[in-house]
């Protein structure tokens, strides 16, 4: 038990250093973790209109990203991406293809405390109108050569967006994965 506690403390110190947070914050997260460690799942929706992709700007960080978020326990990936797009944009959509499943740690971003797999879906608008939310303060469509400079690369990278455009123009391509 003493060895385990010492290792957990060292891990908290390392996590705090790389996550740029207090050691106590990481130690508390470790204390809350129960059971076998498994990855978290993040969904992102690629919605296209007039050869542009739908993006939202986060109210808190003022960074642009694709609409999306964490999959809740008991929720399917397609239900999660549909819900997230509706909540963040006002558009009701239908997922038509799983474009990619990526390991977040392999895409050049600073490591996240938990391991994250990102699921990118191509979705079609069924109905609705642009509407901001508690999480988003702007909604816009962007061309592939005119992406916003303040992109939330922790959520989506420019190369991932270009992959989504490639699949949009070539719908018969297979799903990509790491």
Please tell me what each predicted stretch does:
Residues 2-44:
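Acidic, metal-coordinating catalytic segment for phosphate/diphosphate chemistry
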Residues 23-25, 75-76, 169-171:
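Juxtamembrane/interface motifs at transmembrane-helix termini
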């Amino acid at each position: 038990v003493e060895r385990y506690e010492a290792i957990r403390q060292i891990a908290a110190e390392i996590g705090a250093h790389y996550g740029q947070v207090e050691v106590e914050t990481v130690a508390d997260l470790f204390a809350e973790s129960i059971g076998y460690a498994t990855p978290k799942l993040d969904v992102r929706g690629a919605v296209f209109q007039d050869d542009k992709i739908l993006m939202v700007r986060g109210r808190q960080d003022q960074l642009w990203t694709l609409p999306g978020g964490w999959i809740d326990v008991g929720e399917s990936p397609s239900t999660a991406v549909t819900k997230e797009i509706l909540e963040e944009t006002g558009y009701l959509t239908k997922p038509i293809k799983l474009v990619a499943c990526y390991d977040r740690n392999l895409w050049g971003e600073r490591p996240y405390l938990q391991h994250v797999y990102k699921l990118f879906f191509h979705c079609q608008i069924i109905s609705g109108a642009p509407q901001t939310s508690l999480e988003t303060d702007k909604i816009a469509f962007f061309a592939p050569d005119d992406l916003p400079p303040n992109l939330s690369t922790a959520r989506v990278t420019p190369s991932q967006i270009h992959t989504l455009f490639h699949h949009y123009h070539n719908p018969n391509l297979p799903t990509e994965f790491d």
